[in-house]
C-alpha cells in the first residue's frame, strides 16, 4: 500500500476514483468534497472496506554493507495485505439549505515487511504507518447551481519502523500522535448530466511521540511528520 490512499470508499474502485469530488452517489462524498453533500436529498449511511494485496518480487539485488564491499544477495519479495475500513454519514436538514456529514476513513498509510532472512537488513525490516481521519463537515446550497462546504479533520496516526532484526544493534521506533486539519469545497451543477467539484484538504504536521530503541538503548522521543495536502 502506498503512503497516500485513495480508498475512502468501495464504489469508486471501478473508475479508479475519478470524479469522487462531485459524483456524490453515496455518503462517502463527505470524505472527498463537503460541498457535494448538497446533492444528496435524504439521510444516508455508507460503510465499506478495501483490502490492498501487495505482491512484489525483487531479483538481481546488489548490496553494499557499511563495512564491506558490494555483493550480490538472494532474491526476495513482499506479500502484504492491508485492510482499510471506512464509514460515512450525510444528513440533510429538512426545510433548510444545510447538510451535515461525518466520516471515519484513512488518507495515509503503508504496510511493508521483509522477511527476517533478507540479506540487506538496513533496507528491509518492517515499515507500518496508519492514520484514522475523523471528520465533521457542513454544506450550504447557495442556489440550484452552487454549493459550498467545509469541515474539520481530527487525524490520529501511528507507526512502527524496525530495521536490522538479526543484528546486535537493532533499530525500532513505535510512536503515535494527533493532528488537526480542515477541508474546503465547492460544487457547481450545470445540468443533470454535467457538474464540477473542487476540494482542498489541509493536512497538518503531526507530532508523533513514542519509544525509539537504537543500539539497545531505549528513549522516549518525538518526531514531526508533515502530511501532504490534497487537492481534487
Question: Can you say where each PLM-predicted feature lies in the sequence?
Answer:
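Generic alpha-helix structural propensity
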Residues: 10, 25, 29-32, 42, ...
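Glycine-rich nucleotide phosphate-binding loop and flanking beta-alpha elements
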Residues: 37-38, 53, 108, 144
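Periplasmic N-terminal accessory/gating domains of Gram-negative outer-membrane beta-barrel systems
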Residues: 17, 21, 26-37
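Transmembrane beta-strand segments of Gram-negative outer membrane beta-barrel proteins
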Residues: 4-19, 38-57
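Short, conserved beta-strand segments within well-ordered enzyme catalytic domains
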Residues: 30-31, 44-50, 88-90, 99-103
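Outer-membrane beta-barrel porins/channels
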Residues: 1-16, 20, 63-73, 81-232
Amino acid at each position: 500500500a502506498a503512503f497516500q490512499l485513495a480508498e475512502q470508499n468501495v464504489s469508486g474502485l471501478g473508475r479508479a476514483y475519478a470524479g469522487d469530488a462531485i459524483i456524490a452517489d453515496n455518503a462517502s462524498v463527505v470524505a472527498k468534497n463537503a460541498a457535494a453533500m448538497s446533492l444528496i436529498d435524504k439521510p444516508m449511511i455508507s460503510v465499506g472496506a478495501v483490502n490492498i494485496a501487495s505482491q512484489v518480487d525483487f531479483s538481481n539485488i546488489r548490496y553494499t554493507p557499511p563495512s564491506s564491499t558490494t555483493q550480490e544477495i538472494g532474491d526476495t519479495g513482499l506479500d502484504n495485505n492491508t485492510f482499510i475500513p471506512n464509514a460515512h454519514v450525510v444528513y440533510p436538514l429538512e426545510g433548510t439549505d444545510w447538510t451535515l456529514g461525518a466520516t471515519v476513513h484513512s488518507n495515509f498509510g503503508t504496510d511493508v515487511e521483509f522477511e527476517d532472512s533478507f540479506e540487506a537488513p538496513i533496507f528491509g525490516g518492517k515499515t507500518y504507518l496508519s492514520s484514522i481521519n475523523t471528520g465533521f463537515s457542513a454544506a450550504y446550497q447557495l442556489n440550484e447551481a452552487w454549493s459550498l462546504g467545509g469541515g474539520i479533520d481530527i487525524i490520529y496516526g501511528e507507526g512502527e519502523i524496525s530495521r536490522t532484526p538479526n543484528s546486535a544493534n537493532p533499530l525500532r521506533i513505535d510512536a503515535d500522535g494527533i493532528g488537526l486539519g480542515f477541508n474546503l469545497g465547492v460544487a457547481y451543477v450545470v445540468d443533470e448530466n454535467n457538474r464540477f467539484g473542487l476540494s482542498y484538504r489541509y493536512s497538518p504536521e503531526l507530532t508523533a511521540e513514542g519509544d525509539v530503541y537504537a543500539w539497545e538503548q531505549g528513549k522516549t522521543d518525538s518526531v514531526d511528520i508533515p502530511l501532504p495536502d490534497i487537492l481534487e
